[in-house]
């Protein structure tokens, strides 16, 4: 593929004319090599029939270079070689570097996407079913304790299990690694009885001490984590015997059991993290339906775990690949092998069947009223949020009387800092553009999820983030508001913290939901929260896919997915 790249470099520099007149010095400079190596490359390209080279003798004399092959032809050949050898990084970089036109880029992306989807092959009279699934988020860490991204949670949910579980669209909590559980009347003591002979991927049998280890490492971590306000209510985890675990809570918390259904509360083996010397996040071992066999910055490969306690998955192998562009912009037709796409664009092929997973993503802006600055003034906040509402379909508009709009206020001369993470940088830039158009001066600061958990939010004026409205919505709202109070002025903070304490003790699901709505309404009335927009999370799939179900986050559940054989 190096020869392909060298051809494309020459074509990019000298391919504009039917025949180019070049010196050896110019060729060496273009290729970034010596005269001797440049001649070797020219001879190889001529041998491939890609160029015609007519040399002229003498130093500095110009020779004739004629291109016999087109750049698209050679680029496509290079990409196909990369795809055939599963070198996705090279393929992606090639598309970025050599696609000089949108039509070529679409062609190359289409070829790459053909690599994805369902593939079946025979090995020793056995059919091996493989699903290649692209994700836009790069996987960094699959440790339930440290993962930050939804894509990481998606993969982790197929490697690990929790004590209890929920299926997509169901409020009822079902047995997981625990076959049953009970609690005392004050609901501060929870006892879980484990299934027998559940195996981890490395052959160890699950025991109560593994559960104790999994939760104790949560309780002692100093890292800011999703749902930390829930598991910080755990006073003690104790193994009563190899098959029984008891949790003692500091106070009743009706979100405790739903928390145990999340991928954050997955059970890990107590002996493995030490043995792997800190690399557990990239070499995880759980009890789930798939085990990880390979993970690098571009590819995560899962293989079926045949001894899974809830039955073997239908797929034999799942390859999850990082593809940085929006998959839907190059979606293949129904004749392609590409079967599953997350979050397809509205322009995807009409031949695709779509189903909503009943979950949505809400993007919002919050104001830092704890910081001394222009947004500590409610009238300025009202004006800022009114600017964001103007001419949009955003939810939760903050209506402001025209007499209170202060378009010429001193805040316009003060730079407002907008903090977010890279995944939401586009939304933050759109917010900045709207406010700039209203006379404000804004600067976007995009930091990693880890940095975002630190003081960055407290130093910003506006924070752009999102809420996944899935089956864990109440947990996410509790975590969101518990975090948000850190950048709110004391009176509002005390009010919200009091409401959250009541919600945590409320056994009725609908009453808890009403409590969260009251918090949202209060923040909107005080111009401290503005919802930018909300859109459903969808999954597109072709008719040949069977067993499409969703996990609690709205992702396709791979353990039930299967493809009928060609008969």
Language-model-detected regions and their locations in the chain:
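Aromatic- and charge-enriched surface segment that lines or borders ligand/interaction sites
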Residues: 17-20, 41, 148, 180-224
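N-terminal lobe/hinge region of extracytoplasmic solute-binding protein
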Residues: 134-183, 216
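Gly/Pro-rich hinge or "lid" segments in bacterial periplasmic/extracellular proteins
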Residues: 146-150, 154-158, 164-169, 261-313, ...
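A structural "hinge/loop" feature
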Residues: 138-152, 204, 256-263, 540-556
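Ligand-site clamp/hinge motif
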Residues: 307-349
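A bilobed periplasmic-binding-protein/Venus flytrap-type ligand-binding module shared by bacterial periplasmic
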Residues: 303-306, 354-380, 501-502
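Detector for C-terminal structural segments
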Residues: 56, 113-117, 383-407, 426-431, ...
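Surface-exposed binding/hinge segments that line
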Residues: 64, 228-271, 294
């Amino acid at each position: 593929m190096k020869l392909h790249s060298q051809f494309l470099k020459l074509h990019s520099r000298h391919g504009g004319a039917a025949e180019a007149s070049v010196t050896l010095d110019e060729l060496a400079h273009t290729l970034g090599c010596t005269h001797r190596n440049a001649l070797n490359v020219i001879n190889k390209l001529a041998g491939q029939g890609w160029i015609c080279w007519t040399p002229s003798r003498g130093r500095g004399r110009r020779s004739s270079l004629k291109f016999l092959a087109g750049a698209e032809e050679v680029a496509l050949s290079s990409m196909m070689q990369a795809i055939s050898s599963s070198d996705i990084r090279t393929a992606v970089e090639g598309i970025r570097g050599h696609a000089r036109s949108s039509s070529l880029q679409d062609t190359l992306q289409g070829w790459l996407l053909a690599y994805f989807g369902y593939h079946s092959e025979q090995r020793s009279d056995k059919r091996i079913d493989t699903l290649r699934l692209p994700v836009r988020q790069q996987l960094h860490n699959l440790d339930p304790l440290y993962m930050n991204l939804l894509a990481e949670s998606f993969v982790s949910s197929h490697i690990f299990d929790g004590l209890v579980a929920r299926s997509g669209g169901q409020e009822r909590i079902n047995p997981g690694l625990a076959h049953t559980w009970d609690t005392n009347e004050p609901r501060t003591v929870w006892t879980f009885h484990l299934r027998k002979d559940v195996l981890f991927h490395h052959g160890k049998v699950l025991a109560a001490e593994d559960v104790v280890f999994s939760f104790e490492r949560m309780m002692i971590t100093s890292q800011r984590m999703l749902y930390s306000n829930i598991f910080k209510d755990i006073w003690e985890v104790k193994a009563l015997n190899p098959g029984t675990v008891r949790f003692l809570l500091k106070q009743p918390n009706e979100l405790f059991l739903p928390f145990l259904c999340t991928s954050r509360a997955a059970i890990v083996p107590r002996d493995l993290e030490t043995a792997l010397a800190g690399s557990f996040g990239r070499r995880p071992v759980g009890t789930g339906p798939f085990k990880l066999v390979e993970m690098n910055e571009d590819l995560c490969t899962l293989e079926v775990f045949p001894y899974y306690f809830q039955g073997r998955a239908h797929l034999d192998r799942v390859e999850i690949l990082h593809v940085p562009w929006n998959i839907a912009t190059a979606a293949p037709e129904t004749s392609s092998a590409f079967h599953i796409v997350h979050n397809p664009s509205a322009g995807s092929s009409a031949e695709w069947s779509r189903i909503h997973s009943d979950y949505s993503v809400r993007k919002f802006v919050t104001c830092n009223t704890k910081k001394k600055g222009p947004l500590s003034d409610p009238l300025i906040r009202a004006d800022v949020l009114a600017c964001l509402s103007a001419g949009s379909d955003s939810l939760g508009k903050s209506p402001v009387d025209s007499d209170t709009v202060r378009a010429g206020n001193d805040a316009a001369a003060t730079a407002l800092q907008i903090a977010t993470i890279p995944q939401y940088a586009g939304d933050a830039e759109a917010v900045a553009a709207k406010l700039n158009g209203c006379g404000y001066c804004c600067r976007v600061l995009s930091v990693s999820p880890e940095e975002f958990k630190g003081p960055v939010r407290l130093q910003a004026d506006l924070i752009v983030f999102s809420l996944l409205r899935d089956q864990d919505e109440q947990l996410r709202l509790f975590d969101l508001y518990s975090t948000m109070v850190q950048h709110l002025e004391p009176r509002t903070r005390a009010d919200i913290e009091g409401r959250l304490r009541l919600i945590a003790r409320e056994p009725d699901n609908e009453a808890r939901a009403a409590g969260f709505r009251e918090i949202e309404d209060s923040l909107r009335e005080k111009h401290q929260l503005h919802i930018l927009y909300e859109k459903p999370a969808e999954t597109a799939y072709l008719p040949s896919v069977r067993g499409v179900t969703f996990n609690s986050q709205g992702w396709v559940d791979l353990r039930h997915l299967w493809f009928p054989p060609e008969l």
